[in-house]
Amino acid sequence: PEVEGLPKVISELYRMILYKRQADDAEMKFLMSGSQDKLLQKLGNEITETIIASKNGEKDKVLHEMADLWYHCLVLLDYHNITPEELLRELGGKRA
């Protein structure tokens, strides 16, 4: 089943990420400072945690870790100046 407003939720979350970066948020400063190594390491950690939760059959933990993973994927999009709308267009092209 489709979640109504999912693109809106993603866009709002992305705007919050942009705001946090401009507001000098400590977590965002840590993830976005210098090279992308810290951000990629965090993304790798979230992927690993999601995989482990899935392997252990922990549905609630999979949901939590997947939310963290999506969040950090949005941070990575911001790092590369890619908007969620661009990503959604790319995903839309996968339906063809």
Residue ranges of predicted features:
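Flexible "arm" and connector segments at domain edges
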Residues: P1-M66, W70-A96
